[in-house]
Design a protein with these regions (language model features):
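C-terminal cap of metal-dependent C-N hydrolases
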Residues: 374-414
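Active-site core of metal-dependent hydrolases
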Residues: 182-313, 320
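Alpha-helical scaffold segments that flank or form the walls of functional sites
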Residues: 32, 63-64, 81-145, 166-180
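Divalent metal-coordination and catalytic microenvironments
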Residues: 14, 31, 35, 61, ...
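N-terminal metal-binding scaffold of metallo-dependent hydrolase/deaminase domains
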Residues: 1-50, 360, 364, 410
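His/Asp/Glu-enriched, well-ordered alpha-helical/loop segment
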Residues: 300-383
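Active-site gating loops and adjacent loop-to-helix segments of metal-dependent hydrolytic enzymes
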Residues: 79-110, 148-154, 221-262, 334-344
Length: 414
């Protein structure tokens, strides 16, 4: 992908979905921007004020909205198609362990770059990449897509704790070499069943010291829930291959306590009963609906999420547990999986929780069409609706890809 032009631009759109807290939709307005949004006004006024120095972009029949944020993916598994087994979390996990080295070797530059292009074509301007091996570092750093790069740490065998920590530090320090506003190193603690408490504590202390974002998988399966609650189930048989006498490192509550006052994305959480255990100021839930359907046969209880006032966001997860990294495919899947939701209301919520709400949590000054925000946005082909309340829904239903994508005000060439 290449970036085109640094010049100020005036973009005219038929409808502008601002994705602000009221889900305001503007009609027949212009957005003036360079790398940030300078003004939103009538097109004639924009041309009169800025026309001599600005490039005119005429999308008078189309829709403009903020670029999506996909905060949880695994690009290192981009080679998977039918290698991994779905339908049962433990079967899937065993197939991952058996195949991960082969799949990571097959995830060459071209495979990862292809999936990044798919993400961008579906309107994604920012990703949260969970990196287990570090083979994706330079690819993400040079991809043109904004990347929060979660260096992953795990390890349950007490004989290899120091080795696990040193390997993590080596990968993290390497990723720091690429740090800028488009590539942000961060930390992922894999999960409570795979990460010894001493490693989780070290990772959390490291994050506090260096002001880093964190991510973790949490209560993705019934197996994990039973393991943390009591410790005696099929999960123990699985864990015997990593430790002679495996025992739970945590209870669900004690695991969460390690992330106190740390901005953390807790991914999945489909077997969480009480969301009040999270801190709404520092914690958010990442929802991967397709992945949960394939592996856990359960989905997130959105009513419990809303009642707790905790932020939630939408992610595709990786091709290890999904058939597509196209973000619009994931949004459509949510409409079907959460079949008790009002379609139009839920569509608006999905768009907000994939843009402005996630940006606020991640500390990114974007995700909303408003003055001063970073100019990350997408153009969608126009269509007619008789009711404005249908716009969000029809954007999700009618589009496989965006027409154009701008990241930091620069046009992305697909």
């Amino acid at each position: 992908m290449t970036f085109l032009g640094e010049k100020m631009k005036i973009l005219l759109a038929k409808h502008i979905l601002t994705c602000d807290e009221n889900f305001t939709i503007l009609h027949d307005k212009a957005v003036v921007f360079d790398d940030k949004i300078i003004e939103i006004c009538d097109f004639k006024n924009a041309v009169k004020k800025y026309g001599n120095e600005a490039e005119i972009l005429d999308y008078r029949n189309d829709f403009l909205m903020p670029a999506f944020i996909n905060p949880h993916i695994h690009l290192e598994f981009s080679a998977n198609r039918t290698t991994l087994e779905y339908g049962d979390f433990l079967k899937w996990l065993k197939s991952v362990i058996n195949s991960r080295d082969e799949l990571s070797k097959e995830a060459k530059n071209a495979a990862i770059k292809k999936q990044i292009e798919i993400l961008k074509k579906s309107g994604v301007g920012t990703i949260g990449e969970i990196s287990s091996f570090g083979i994706d570092t330079e690819i993400c750093a040079n991809s043109g897509i904004r990347t929060i790069f979660f260096n992953e740490i795990l390890g349950s065998n007490p004989n290899f704790i120091n080795q696990s920590w040193e390997k993590f530090l080596t990968r993290f320090e390497y990723s720091k070499n690429f740090t800028n506003d488009m590539f942000i190193p961060a930390i992922s603690v894999h999960s409570p069943y795979s990460t010894a408490e001493i490693l989780t504590k070290k990772a959390c202390d490291f994050a506090r010291k260096n002001n880093l974002l964190m991510s973790t998988h949490f209560l993705e399966s019934g197996y994990e829930r039973e393991w943390l609650d009591g410790g005696n189930n099929d999960f123990k048989k699985y864990l015997l291959q990593f430790s002679e006498n495996p025992k739970p490192f945590y209870t669900p509550k004690s695991f969460i306590e390690h992330f106190k006052e740390l901005r953390t994305l807790f991914t999945h959480c489909v077997f969480v009963d009480d969301f009040s255990v999270f801190d709404v100021k520092f914690h958010a839930i990442t929802h991967c609906a397709v992945s949960n359907r394939f592996l856990s046969a359960k989905t997130l209880d959105l009513n419990k999420i809303r009642a707790s006032n905790i932020n939630y966001n939408i992610a595709t997860d990786g091709l290890s547990s999904n058939i597509s990294l196209n973000f619009l495919d994931e949004l459509r899947a949510n409409l079907f999986i959460h079949d008790n939701e009002n379609l139009c209301d839920f569509a608006r919520e999905l768009l907000q929780n994939s843009t402005s709400e996630t940006a606020k949590f991640l500390g990114l000054d974007l995700g909303e069409i408003s003055i001063g925000k970073i100019a990350d946005f997408s153009i969608f082909n126009g269509f007619e609706v008789s009711d404005e309340n249908q716009i969000a829904l029809q954007i999700i239903l009618q589009n496989k890809n965006v027409k154009k994508l701008f990241i930091k005000g620069k046009l992305c060439e697909f």
